C-alpha cells in the first residue's frame, strides 16, 4: 500500500493556483487573478512568494489599485531583489504616476539585471524624455534599437525626440522605419505627417494623415493634424470640418477645440471662436493657450475687460507666456490705462528681451505718455531685433517728426508704403506709372495722389506749388470730391481729378507721388517749410454766406469746431464730448459764434443752449469751398484737431486749436504753442499735466476774453 504525505496535496494545489492566476492575468481577467491569489494561504501581509506578489501587483495595476500595486511590487523586490519582472512593473507604475525620478532609478536597477532588455531601454527613454532629458532619451532609444532592430515603438520614440530637436530628416527616417515594421499603425502615419509638414512637404503630409484615417477614420489626432495642415494651406472651411470631426470623435480633445477656435478666428467668426475656446477650457481649465486665444477673440469682439481677464488667467497658468503679457498690454492700452500697459510690455520683455513686438508696443505707449527719449529707445531696440519691422519704423518716424528731427523722420515715414494695413500699401498696385523717388521732374507729367485725410491735403497742398517749381510740366491732383472745387483754384495745378479717373489715366503720367512724400524728396527741415497755400474763396460763395449770416451788429464772429471725423483712430480723444463742453466761452461778451460742424456735432449746433447766439451753418456746407467762404467772414476759429484748422490757418485766419491729452498728432510737434507749418496764425492749447477738457476750455475762454479786451461774465 502506498501512502500519501499529508502536506503534498496542498502544495500541488498552491502551485496550480499560482499558475492559474498567471494565466488569468495573461488573459486580461485581472479581477479573477487577484481574487485567486488573495485566497491563497501564502498571501498575507508577510507574503514571501515573489511570483504571487508580482501577480497581485500586476492585477492591481490593471484594476487601477495603484497603491496596492506599488506595495506588492516593493514587497516582491524586498523578498527577491533580483526579480527583474518586478522592477519592470514598478517602473511602469511609477511612470504612470509621473514619479519620473523614481521610475528612472527602477529601470536602471532592472538594466543591471537584464542589460540587454530592449523594452527596458525603451521605457527608460520614455521616462528620460518626460524629464526633459532629450539627449539621454535618444541614447536609450538607440540602445533599444541596437539590441532589437525590429522594435517599432523605439523607432517611433526616436522619431519623436528627433522631431523635437529639429532634426527633421532623421525623424522622417525613424518614422519610416517604424512604419516598415508596423505599416498599419495609424498613429505612426500621423506622426510621420507631422514631420513632413514641418519639412514643408504638405502634399506628402496630407497623404500620411489620410493614410492614418483610412486605417482609423475616428483617429482624432489624425483629424486634428489634418485640420492644422489645411489651416496652414488656407483651406479654412475644410480645416473647420476636420477639427469639428476631431471634437465629435473625442469631445474632451482640448487642443482640437483650441485649433477649431483659431480657424474660426481666421474666418472672422470671433463669437464662434469664443465658444470653441471655452469648450477647450471646460475640458482643461489650466490650458494657458486657450485662455490666451480666448483673450484674442474677446479683444476682437471689443469686450476689453473680459479680454483682460482672459490674458491674466493665461499668465496665471503660464507666467512666462510672453504673448499673453504683450497682448495684455495691448488691451490695457485700448482701455487708456497706459502706465499699466507699459508695465505689461516691460514684463513681456523681462521674459523675452528679443520680442520685437513688445519693444514696439512699449514705444507706442511711452510716446503717448510723452516719454519721448524712452519711446525712441524702445522703437530702436525693436528695429535692432527686426530691421524690416514696418510698425516700429513708422512709429519711430512719427516720433522723430514730432520732435522736429525731419531728416531721419521723413525718410522713415516712407515706410508707410510697406504697411499692409495702410491704404498707401495698395496705391503702388493701383497706379500704372512709376512712383517718384526724388529724381528731376523737369518736363514731366506728375500725378499727385491723395492717400491721406482732408486735413493732410490742406496742410501739404503747399507742395503742389513746390513740385511745379521744380520744373514739372503738368501736375494732376487726384482727390476726394469735397476738395476738388478748392484745389481747382490753386495756381500750378493743371487738373483736379477723382480717384477713379486718375487711376484709369495713370499710365499717361511719367510718375506719381503723394503730397506727404514731397517733404522727404525736397529735403524739408523745420526751417525750410514752404508757406501754406492761401486758399482764395469764390466771391459768389462769400456773398451767399454773408447774406446767410446777416449783420454782426458790432460783434466779432468766431467759428467753432468741437468734433472731428468719427472714423479717425484718435477721435475719442481729440473730439470734445459735446457742444456743452464749450460753455465757458459763452461767458465772453461781444461774440457771435458760428458752428462749422458738418456731420458729427450738427445736431448739437441746431439745438444750442438757451439764449446762446450760435449760428448752425452745417446745413449749407457742401464742400471745402463753402467752408472757406464761411471762414473768410470770421474773425477767429476755435477748434479741435480737424481739417478746419488747416483751412483757416492756410487762409491766414487766426486759429486756436485745443489738443487732446494723449496721442497728439506728430505735426503739432512738442514743446511749443505755435506751429512752423502755420506761423503767426495758429495757436496751440496743450493740456497741462492731468488737465481735462473743462479746464483747458476755461483757459481758452480766458484767452478769448483777453483777445476781446473784455472781462468774462458769470453765466446765470
Predicted segments — roles?
Residues 1-716:
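Alpha-helical solenoid repeat scaffolds of the TPR/TPR-like class and their adjacent stem/linker regions
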